[in-house]
């Protein structure tokens, strides 16, 4: 077997994004994410995502996040996440990922699912792709990026 046949779920709007995102609360594996927090200006999404992070913590679902390092992201990070979560998050220099700058959402990988959410209006949407091959590849790429990520406690890039 060369590849598994992916299963794709697609939802539009804030409620659709929430419906897809809830799947990560049932994960039996670590949840890894790349976040463009600049796009989290919508209070409803911001509050929902930070609430889900608290629920995953209570359920002891491990989580690691790479966050694009911008001044807006640093402010939103403080608003959305509790201090004990900081150790499992790292900043990524956006200039090292020019193709991802401004993508406007989040990529999360858990179990055999890859979830992409696009948050800015118009065009709010999300999709979950179930594919072992895709998630194995994304997990490997995430680990490479994790190794070059900077600790959440470090000063912003423009102050280094």
Kindly give the residue locations of the regions a language model identified.
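PLD/PLD-like phosphodiesterase catalytic module centered on the HKD motif
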Residues: 1, 9, 46-160
């Amino acid at each position: 077997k060369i590849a598994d046949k992916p299963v794709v779920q697609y939802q539009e709007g804030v409620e659709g994004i929430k419906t897809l995102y809830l799947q990560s609360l049932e994960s039996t594996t670590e949840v890894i994410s790349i976040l463009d927090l600049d796009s989290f200006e919508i209070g409803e999404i911001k509050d929902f995502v930070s609430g889900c992070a608290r629920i995953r913590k209570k359920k002891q679902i491990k989580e690691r996040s790479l966050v694009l390092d911008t001044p807006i992201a640093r402010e939103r990070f403080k608003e959305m996440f509790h201090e004990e979560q900081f150790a499992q998050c790292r900043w990524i220099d956006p200039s090292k990922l020019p193709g991802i700058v401004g993508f406007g959402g989040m990529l999360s990988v858990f179990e055999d699912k890859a979830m992409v959410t696009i948050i800015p209006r118009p065009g709010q949407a999300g999709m979950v792709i179930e594919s072992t091959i895709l998630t194995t590849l994304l997990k490997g790429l995430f680990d490479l990026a994790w190794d070059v990520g900077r600790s959440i406690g470090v000063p912003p890039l423009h102050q280094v």
